[in-house]
């Protein structure tokens, strides 16, 4: 028992023994010190054994197949545990159950993602099987627990990692938790693997792993900070703290997870072309202000993002909210301080260009792609495009799920890209995420007559068929030199017209190479912005309106373009123009809310449509020139009968109207709003679609002449192409600044956009 460490007695044969008190005392002292050290060592060993005994008791209880003694069934040698031990054991079980619930949710998401790949018949079978799998009775649960206990002897049951309870945690009842101990012990083998694969998922299942987002996004997020916020813990070793940190995660709630892992997809500018910046310092301006111009038609350069003039200075909160009958559903408040607000003639639109990125670095992204091990294994990776290609995201199929299934899975974009891959040879390999794929939230909703809103299940031919683009490719960048508030393209697609401050520039885009304007049409005053320009159908005349009471009509057929007529109204500014199909009549939306009808042959005012209580912002013609649609800052869209000269319809919204367009061959009206929503209304029935891909004001909107698709642009730098009417996203482009205006050529082969970074961009539409 004792080590052979005692000092030997220095006795030798033949030597007489001499008794000495001092020597005896020294020996006693040495023996005492030796015994004291040995006692201390044995005490430490005893404490260690006691600690191991307590730990074994905990594992013994966790692996016990029977209920707690309080439950009525006693175990032959049930260990007596302190309340603290039961408390910690309950906390560990609680963590384990949350982990298992998370695993179930992710597996359910995988099942829901797989359902669209099946035939309709197999989909029903799978959904029924999923429903049956969720109906587990108590008897089945007890049977499963018994089988697991037989397969796993207690001596080999792996321990469940226990963690010290965090401060303030309310302990769960041990009785109910211990009933699940057998099943939890059997599942404990998954702990290590799950901890490595664990990826935070928000309440809607819309967040993907940060590392993969940085890899798959066209540009890195501006700010992605991940911090750990451990709770107050009682110490029981570094390993337990690490496991607890891994299981509980750095977030206090699912909502916090979403907030901490937002991925901002913005391009990092290479060099600032202009010292002017937006008030907020980061978001590009939305559009030149279109507010009060009653004093003088001053510059558009003072109220960032205010799209229209106001006839009176009122705050956004004071605007009429509209009637409940036709109000848009789910609209959001203004995005930031640069959205339309009260203004005067002196601050009608300071358009500051966000520092522009090189054209070859503009982020062009497919909005509905998904990078994950799931998509990678099925060759469903996101597009990897070159030289400004806009990739078609693929087919997005809505899920028809039972309430049980749909409760655990958000409606999302199905990554069916295999059949519709536009550039398979350019596709980059998907980044393998260490987690479960999560679909983005639904972005298209159908609103019925009774106001019920449901995610839209897209048909299988949503992104295929005649007249549906596959993607778009950037062709030209036209350096206008000022913020481009108006663009139009000729019917021959030879010339593009860009309107900025005080002039319209004409560009020949028929030939490749660098572009310089072939003509400059000086209009209005030099400091006033052009807000709209329209070509007559014959392409021989151009009508220009903006921050002035005068419309200019240019003769483009002359050897040198010249003004051949001017039309003057009482309103201080014009913000939108439309020309009748027969080119005999022109309509102008005025800052005072009136719609002026002009006779182009006699160059005279014919009539005014009065109804908007605030500035009229946008306009379009339908029904072969017999109806006029207008939108305004009074939150209304109005329909006018041009033959009878009266208002036919009025649709009220809870957000200002910035843009609209009528489908050329169907009864659908698309409306772009300050709330960032695009709403597609049926003009003869009380139903509509609400589209939510924009992140800020929707500033312009244009239908293709075939009517099967349309585009919208916004303050969020995005150009979105949508399927009519349900809004399946065809492609998406992210420019370097707010996209203020757009136009589509008559043959639907080209798209032109004007932006806040003082340039216009020409895209080729590829079918």
Swiss-Prot record:
Name the residue ranges with Polar residues bias.
Answer: 323-346
| Species for this entry | Mus musculus
Q: Please give the SUPFAM superfamilies that the UniProt record associates with this protein.
A: WD40 repeat-like
Does the keyword Nucleotide-binding belong to this entry?
A: no
Phosphothreonine, modified sites: 278
Where is the sequence biased in composition, kind Low complexity? Answer: 296-309
Q: What is its main location?
A: nucleus
Q: Which UniProt keywords apply?
A: Nucleus, Phosphoprotein, Repeat, Repressor, Transcription, Transcription regulation, Ubl conjugation, WD repeat, Wnt signaling pathway
Self-association and partners: Homooligomer and heterooligomer with other family members. Binds LEF1, TCF7, TCF7L1, TCF7L2, UTY, HES1 and HES5.
Q: Give the gene that encodes this protein.
A: Tle2
Which Gene Ontology cellular-component terms appear in the entry?
focal adhesion; nuclear body
Q: What is known of its domains?
A: WD repeat Groucho/TLE family members are characterized by 5 regions, a glutamine-rich Q domain, a glycine/proline-rich GP domain, a central CcN domain, containing a nuclear localization signal, and a serine/proline-rich SP domain. The most highly conserved are the N-terminal Q domain and the C-terminal WD-repeat domain.
Q: What is this protein called?
A: Transducin-like enhancer protein 2
Q: This protein's superkingdom?
A: Eukaryota
How does the record describe the protein's post-translational processing? Answer: Ubiquitinated by XIAP/BIRC4.
